[in-house]
Amino acid sequence: MPSPFFAEEKDIPENQNVGNKRWKKLIKGEGSDDGKEKSSDDDDSSSSTKGLFGWRGDTSSGNLFDFPNTLTDVGETKQIVDATTIVDQLEAADLGAALNLKLSFLKQDFDELPVIKKLPDNLNDTIVAKSDNLEKTSKTNSTFYKDNGDSSEKQGSAESKNSPKTQLKEIFNGQNGDSGNLGKLAEQLQKTDSTKMEARSQTWQLRNAVSLKTTNMAQSDENYLLLDAAIPAFETSSQSPQSSGTISGSGALVNLTSTSVNLTQQKSSTTPLNQRIVRNSTGVKLLALEGLLYYVVGSSNKQQSSSSTIATSLAQNQSNNNQEQEINSSLQKNLLKFRAFQAKN
């Protein structure tokens, strides 16, 4: 079973086929660090040879991945940690996303890898591709996010020199050296002469995200289509609860039609590491990391506009009391720091 965004193995030269190998190892559980195939005798638990598929359970709303509540053994733990954080420089996710973009949109040769470019530290290697081909991009197994763009670009015809878009242009004027895979993707997208796709970098809150920005002309909505796989640590906040309980669609980064986004934290500080991912045709619908549960539920408020979302969290303040708080626009950007490996339905 190929990954949802890695090219077919037969289409990639052996020395460049990193993505499919990582997919097989981390997701399917095939092969080990030394390149040898695992046998069922390698571990007492047969699930240890199945990668993330070992915890897959089909549900009416998509695939459910229930990872172990405690990570104690070496083999399974490394598979899970690698797959959810991509500790080896996001290698599998970034190359996979780059290959997918190249094959689906850029129509380049299968064996041509992007040129490497280093992004400034304040951009944190974050690349967004903008496309008005919503029909094509929406068919991938990814999650959509909504943003209104960089405010500095809307204040006048002249772009701010500090805007991500301006900095991205400077990157490709040869001001920086070569670096990681996200930089590769940035260069490749920037070189693309197409009205249907635009390379763009976001701020630090969206770091390490490789995504497609699509425009729905009928609804005038812009959505971010997430392609990569890393799940960095979520930054909790000790801010006081906001006075209002609803964030309008125009101010929300998460765009999930007729749904609310609820963030809750386990009340017990001793809650073990628990990770869970629910997927359906539109993407990740639930995931948790280090005791923090992030999940999407249908809105029970019939008066709520389908274009709006509610984002709340149950966080601990400095006095160690649990309190529910609204996630403001800035904190919502942290939602984009949570990605799930693109497991095919």
From Swiss-Prot:
Alphabetical list of InterPro entries matching this protein: DUF3713
Q: Name one Pfam family in it.
A: DUF3713
Bias-annotated ranges (Polar residues): 154-165
Q: Where is this region: Disordered?
A: 1-58, 139-165
Ranges of biased composition (kind: Basic and acidic residues)? 27-39
Q: Which family does it belong to?
A: Belongs to the MG307/MG309/MG338 family.
The protein's name is Uncharacterized protein MPN_438
